[in-house]
Curated annotation (Swiss-Prot):
Highest taxon of the lineage: Bacteria
Residues of the active site: 206 (proton donor), 336 (proton acceptor)
Taxon lineage: Bacteria, Bacillati, Cyanobacteriota, Cyanophyceae, Synechococcales
Residues that coordinate or bind (2R)-2-phosphoglycerate: 164, 336, 365-366, 387
Organism, scientific name: Synechococcus sp. (strain JA-2-3B'a(2-13))
Entry GO MF terms: magnesium ion binding; phosphopyruvate hydratase activity
Membership in a protein family: Belongs to the enolase family.
The protein, known as: Enolase
Residues the entry annotates as binding Mg(2+): 243, 284, 311
PANTHER family with a match to the protein in the record: ENOLASE (PTHR11902:SF1)
Broadest EC class assigned to this enzyme: lyase
Pfam families: Enolase_C, Enolase_N
Alphabetically ordered keywords of this record: Cytoplasm, Glycolysis, Lyase, Magnesium, Metal-binding, Secreted
Enzyme Commission numbers on file: 4.2.1.11
Cofactor note: Binds a second Mg(2+) ion via substrate during catalysis.
């Protein structure tokens, strides 16, 4: 069988923060190969699949991944040798069964995901298709709206801003290439605005600026100024999005925000105020991952006006997503393959979300690599949205550049999600 897995190798490498991660290379009988590198998050949900680290304080402060590498070279390779790489669902189920734990803690979700993605890439090469076409078929032609994280706070930056991400959303562009240009031009102007105000232009983990500001609203004001000075119309050409990462704000049942303790109802009232004053289309993790009652109330009050995204709430997990659907908590899901650990489970989460009328956003992590799989995945699944950072740092730009290549390859068949109303909006 030409597409049988013949060998698998793996290496400990570094991510964009200088922390260890791993890559896997899968080789098939016909000579096709697939390389995949896995990312790592800074603000992680409690219910994410387990990222296996060595725990040896003498190496990388315990963050090494040599155990995960050994799991790939040993039991995973033995299990998958001779299996057909074209049967992704079987490959992923074999990996899940081999691990045998609910959260992939024995082999490590990082080891499992690297092999899962590398297998798909090898299979795509074997049949002579780009990854997005191999995964998505003839209807893989929708280019996602990018949610560009240009101002950072929270766990992604060392500053006094509570909200983790302030994003540009170029909904008014005619193509992905134009959307990327919109964002890049505003990002350049934003740097000038910060310099004129004597504010820091140092960047956070995802490439956004991380200045010290008086309030979270001050960050939104900076974005509005930069959009206008770049020659665009806020709300028409470029809208805004937030990732609050409220888990990071929760202490003793209260949300500690701008120096005060707040209830879930207080936070929702605050978001209502922001929506009245700014063209915000999307709020991610506005409340904590176990505040289901708060999420239900927030969705009831705001869900008809804004996209309410569950990241830590759902962690790309089918069980948690189904609970959100059943309880009317959130109306969109952030999709991070490393939260769940296999390509098949990732696609299943997307399918469940779409069936329920939820929007889907394919996402990077704060600790990234030059791997561009999520760009192909966004097009393959017609997700309509992608989060992959700011307009600097090459591990972020790599994904944008891959989307440019895909759009060019599709030619006239390419459709930009923002142009046809498939980007972020209320249900």
């Amino acid at each position: 069988m030409e597409t049988a897995i013949e060998w698998i190798t793996a290496h400990e490498i570094l991510d964009s923060r200088g922390r260890p991660t791993l890559e896997a290379l899968v080789g098939l009988a016909n000579g096709a190969t697939g390389l995949a590198q896995v990312p790592s998050g800074a603000s992680t949900g409690t219910f994410e699949a387990h990222e296996l680290r060595d725990g040896d304080p003498k190496r990388y402060g315990g963050k090494g991944v040599l155990r995960a590498v050994e799991n790939i070279l040993g039991p995973i390779q033995s299990e998958l040798q001779g299996e057909d790489a074209l049967n992704q669902a079987r490959i992923d189920q074999l990996l899940i069964d081999l691990d045998g734990t609910p959260n992939k803690s024995r082999l490590g979700a990082n080891a499992i995901l690297a092999v899962s993605l590398a297998t798909a890439k090898a299979a795509a090469e074997a049949v002579g298709l780009p990854l997005y076409k191999y995964l998505g078929g003839p209807f893989a032609n929708l280019l996602p709206v990018p949610l560009m994280n240009v101002l950072n706070g929270g766990a992604h930056a060392d500053n006094n801003v509570d909200i983790q991400e302030f994003m540009l959303v170029p909904i008014g562009a005619a193509s992905f290439r134009e959307a990327l240009r919109y964002g890049a031009e505003v990002f350049a102007v934003l740097k000038q605005v910060l310099q004129q105000k004597g504010l820091s232009t140092g960047v956070g983990d995802e490439g956004g600026f991380a200045p010290d500001l008086d309030s979270n609203a001050a960050a939104l004001d900076l974005l509005m100024t930069a959009i206008e000075q770049a020659g665009y119309k806020p709300g028409a050409d470029i809208a805004l999005a937030l990732d609050v990462a409220a888990n990071e704000l929760l202490q003793d049942g209260q949300y500690h925000f701008e120096g005060k303790a707040h209830s879930a109802a207080d936070m929702v009232a605050y978001y209502q105020q922001l929506l009245a004053n700014y063209p915000i289309l999307s709020i991610e993790d506005g409340l904590a991952e176990e505040d289901w009652a708060g999420w239900q109330a927030m969705t009831a009050q705001l869900g008809s006006r804004v996209q309410l995204v569950g990241d830590d709430l759902f962690v790309t997990n089918l069980t948690r997503l189904q609970k959100g659907i059943d309880s009317a908590a959130a109306n969109a899901i952030l999709i991070k393959p490393n939260q769940i650990g296999t390509l098949t489970e990732t696609v299943s989460a997307i399918q469940l979300a779409v069936q329920a009328g939820f929007r889907t956003i394919i996402s990077h992590r704060s600790g990234e690599t030059e791997d561009t799989t999520i760009a192909d995945l966004a097009v393959a699944t017609r997700a309509g949205q992608i989060k992959t950072g700011s307009l600097c740092r090459s591990e972020r730009i790599a994904k944008y550049n891959q989307l440019l290549r895909i759009e060019d390859e599709l030619g006239e068949a390419a459709v930009y999600a923002g142009r046809v109303g498939l980007g972020p909006r209320a249900r």
